[in-house]
Curated annotation (Swiss-Prot):
Its EC number is 3.5.4.2. It comes from the Bacteria. One of its GO terms (biological process) is adenine catabolic process. Pfam families: Adenine_deam_C, Amidohydro_1. The gene is ade. This is Adenine deaminase. SUPFAM superfamilies: Composite domain of metallo-dependent hydrolases (SSF51338), Metallo-dependent hydrolases (SSF51556). Keywords: Hydrolase, Manganese. Belongs to the metallo-dependent hydrolases superfamily. Adenine deaminase family. The keyword Disulfide bond does not apply. It catalyses: adenine + H2O + H(+) = hypoxanthine + NH4(+). Its cofactor is Mn(2+).
Amino acid sequence: MRHCDSFCELIPMKGCEAILEWMIDQGAGREPADIVLKGGRFLDLITGELVESDIAICEDRIVGTFGTYRGKHEIDVSGRIVVPGFIDTHLHIASSQVTPHEFDRCVLPQGVTTAICDPHEIANVLGAEGIRFFLDSALETVMDIRVQLSSCVPATHMETSGAELLIDDLLPFADHPKVIGLAEFMNFPGVLAKDPECMAKLRAFQGRHIDGHAPLLRGLDLNGYIAAGIRTEHEATNAEEALEKLRKGMYVLVREGSVSKDLKALMPIITERHAQFLALCTDDRNPLDIADQGHLDYLIRTAIAGGVEPLAIYRAASVSAARVFGLFDRGLVAPGQRADLVVVDSLEGCHAEIVLSAGRVVSEALFAARKPVAEVGRNSVKAPRVTASNFRSQSNSGKTRAIGIVPGKIITQNLEFDLKVGPNGVEPDLERDVVKVAVIERHGKNGNIATGFVHGFGLKAGAIASTVSHDSHNICVVGASDEDIATAANRLGEIEGGFVVVRDGKVLAEIPLPIAGLMSTEPYETVREALRKLRHAAEDLGSVLEEPFLQLAFIALPVIPHLKITDRGLVDVDKFEFVGN
C-alpha cells in the first residue's frame, strides 16, 4: 500500500482511477478488502452507539462498516473496541526531547495518529532551517505530523533569541502540504496594539487556521484578539475562562502536559453539548511521563475516571479535533475516512492494543522503513564561560522580587521577600525556599546574564540547568550556590545543551540535547531513562516539583503571567515591562 496524505496525492491519474475502483468494489463487498477488522465493536461518534461490525480497509481508507466483509488480511479484534485515531491539536515535539522520528515511535503506538505541532522551539534557535527540519521529518514519519508555522519568533523583544522570523520568512512555507496555518499567536499585546509585524502575519493568513495563545485575556480585549481571525485557545486554565472563550466562538483545546495540567479544571466543560467545540492537546510532554502515564490515552482515561461521558471525550480526541483544523478526511470510523484506527481494551481503559495509521498496522518494521532526516543545529550553544562572580547581586537592599512557582502551572506569582544582604550581595534563603535563578544568552549575540530569585523549587543545595527555556532557549539555571550555578551553566556548553544537575561542583546527572540544544540524537527509551535519573538527582537536591525541568523551562517565557526573567532582566508580564529586583 502506498502511503500519502491523500490516496491521489502522489499517484498518476490513471492509478488514482484504479484505486477509486478498488475502493468502490471493496466497500460494496464485491472484492476482498485489503484489511478487515473482524469480531469487534466500534464507537460511532455520531450516534454514540457501540456497533458490532466488521471494518473494511482499502489502501489508506476505511471503505466499509455496518456489514460483514472478507479480507486479504483479517485481524481478529473480538472483545475489543475500535475508535478513531487520536489527534493532538497543539504540541511542541521538541519538548519531548527527541526528534520527530523518535516522537513518532514513542506516541503512535499509544494511538496518536495525527499531531499538529508548532516548531517554534527550534525556530527560535535556528530560524527557517528549524522549520524546514520539521517539515522534512513530517514527510517521513508514519504518523501524520502537521505543522503550524511559528508566528512569534521571538515571542517578544524582551529576550534574545537565536533567530527572528518575519512574514517574508514564513511565506515560502505557507503552501507546503504539511502546513495548516499559523501557530499560537503569543504576542497578544502586539495584536491589540496593532503592531505592524503582527498585522502583516495576521493579514497573510486570514482565511487559514490561526492558533491562539491568550492566558487570562478576557472581556473586550479578548473580542479584539478573536476579531483578528484567531480561532483556538489552549491556555484556558479554568472553566469560567474556557466558557467565555467558547461563547465568543473560540475552540478550546483542553491541555494536559508535563507542567501545564488543566484537564481537571476544565472537566466541567467537557460535555456532549460542548464537545464539538473542544479538542485535546498536550503542549509539552516528556517521554518519561508518556511512558509512565501515556499521551492522549492518559487524558481520555483520566477524564472518564473524573466523570466525563466517554462520548464527549472521544469526540474531542478525534472528530472534533479534525473539524477544528479542517482535516475532514479523518476522525470517524466510517467509509471514506482515513484509516487511522485504535483498537482499545475498553472505552474506560483506553489501552491501545493495535494501531493503524493510514491503513497500515503500526509495527517496529514500519518505523524501520522510514528515511532518516539529516541532523541540524549542532554546536548551537555559544554562551560565554561564567564564574560564581557573574551571579552575585549588587543590590544593597534586601527587599527583593521573586518568581513564585505554581506547581502544575506555567503561570507564576510576583512575590517579594526581605532577604539578607551579605558580602556578595543579596543571598538566597533556603529556609524559606528562595534560591537564585539566572538566564544566560547562549546564541553568541551579546553574552547577557540576568539574575533574580525564585520561590517554590525546594532546593537545599546544588543547581539544575537547562537550554530548554521557552521560547528563546537561553541557558536557565536555578541554584542554591553561585559556584554550582556556574558549574551547571558551563557544563551545558560542553555537552551542546541539555539538562544538568550539579552539587558541590560535581555533575550528578545530565542529558545532552545536541540538536539545537533541544533534542537528543538517542532513542526515546534512552532519553526516558536519563530523565528518570535527572528527576532523582533533582529530588536529592531537595526539589519538590513533579517536573522540575519543564517547570524551569517556563521561567523565562515573558508572555505568561505574572513575573518572568529573560537574559535582559525581570519582566512584569502584566505590565509588559522590565522591573528591578
